[in-house]
Amino acid sequence: MDPILKLQNGSDVRGVAVEGVADEPVTLTPEYANRIVQAFVLWLSKKSGKKASELKIAVGHDSRISAPMLKQQALMAIVAQGATAVDCSMATTPAMFMSLVYEETKYDGSMMITASHLPFNRNGIKFFEPENGGMEKKDLTDMLKIACELTEQIADISSVEKFDLVSLYAENLCTKIREGINSKDNYDKPLTGNHIVVDAGNGAGGFFAQKVLAQLGADTTGSLYLDPDGHFPNHIPNPENKEAMDAIRGAVLNNKADLGLIFDTDVDRMSAVFSDGQEVNRDALIAMMAAILVKDYPNSTIVTDSVTSDKLTAFLEGELHLKHHRFQRGYKNVINECKRLNEEGVVSPLAIETSGHGALKENYYLDDGAYMAVKLLIAAAKTKAEGKILNSLIEKLEPQFETAEYRLKLKGEDFKAYGAKVLEAFTARAKEKGYHIVTPNYEGVRISFKGEANGWALLRQSLHDPNMPLNVEGNGEGDCAKITAMMKELLSGFDQLDISVFDK
């Protein structure tokens, strides 16, 4: 296989961009980046029906140390193919998508140089085009095949236009907050009197404190890691990471803040912390966004990934009277399912993963952490005006008691096929034991337990890697361990499945 094709990771390009980690040679070289972006220009020209010379394509990046090098290659590739390049410098993934939408820009295509929360030596590219937004997996495969046939091209980029996209993006977020709160006392600075801290994890999200919250009157004293630093010296910029959540929780409590917001590196994900230190991530974040949307979309369908809790379903369906459509892992999967439902006449305002990727129909189905933060801030102001606190929106969501996740390694070349055999045998064994297999189910095998142990387990194949994730949730003392033991029994005896993780 051509090494360029190996850089595909779902609908993104991902690879090792700089040396610095043992046994991880550079795979996303400057030359490969150049050829891949050239291929994007050619692919976009064909798709849009425009000549390359008629295309205007924007490039943005996060704080990674390899970003300047990759940006230079991207700009040269665009110019070499005859298109007009725009340098947006430090930006966010959602902002790069919105550059196709804003009247001030309306570019023909854009790209974000990022590898989300991965280590400092990694990088990648996300591509956007106006018709479908983010590129689909098949389209990226086709584009990379074009790149395999190209050679590196050098071009003069000294006169490339520079545009401060993040400032335009921030202005639009400020407008949405002002309109959403519609304060009669202080329309321009509706967050006056609120203390809100941000943890940007040294990624690209620091602008939210400076260009959004502060502009709207909020006190952001105590915010963390707003300065971009591609070495990520403080913690992994990932709202799923315990150390990261501990940091923003500490910032909220130590500064007696009203709310804490935390973003990943490229700001397409977020989580939050209430004033009392309660974390609003995973199931709680999904519940919160659904509770915010329910007034405008009663009886609608919320699409989530597959690893959500039964307790979330009980809250969405029992308390909010919504429908919970538990689908698959992968933010593109949940977004595309949400689109499909709406196209078929099923009202679905939200597609969201436990990872913090959340996309709203009202916002172009764009997974945008900053936009979710905007919705949260508006909701906080409205609940405050009603004499309530933000926590009250999800106070009836039962907290998870105990959870565990295991990644069982698959050996051999054709790990996908072997994983499918494991799932088939696992299902048969579960039925023989009389376990309750949940249906409908759209990914892997989900088993619900009531009686000797209470909770659930989900075994599935990883989207890209040679392993099988197993998620377990127990509802009471000892339930998680009991369910895990039952899973271990069902998964014993497969010669290419490593279950030693259970013994660690």
Predicted segments, located by residue:
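Phosphate-binding and adjacent anionic-ligand microenvironments
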Residues: 297-471, 476-504
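An N-terminal, well-structured beta->alpha segment
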Residues: 1-74, 81, 158-193
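Proline/glycine-rich low-complexity loops and linkers
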Residues: 88-89, 93, 144-175, 274-354, ...
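N-terminal small/polar loop signature for handling phosphorylated ligands or for N-terminal nucleophile
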Residues: 42, 46, 50, 56-122, ...
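Short glycine-rich phosphate-binding loop at a beta-alpha junction
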Residues: 49-62, 86, 195-197, 300-306, ...
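Gly/Ser/Thr-enriched, mixed-charge loops and adjacent short helices
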Residues: 104, 121-252
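Conserved phosphate/anionic-ligand binding catalytic regions in large, soluble enzymes, centered on
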Residues: 5-22, 200, 204, 350-354, ...
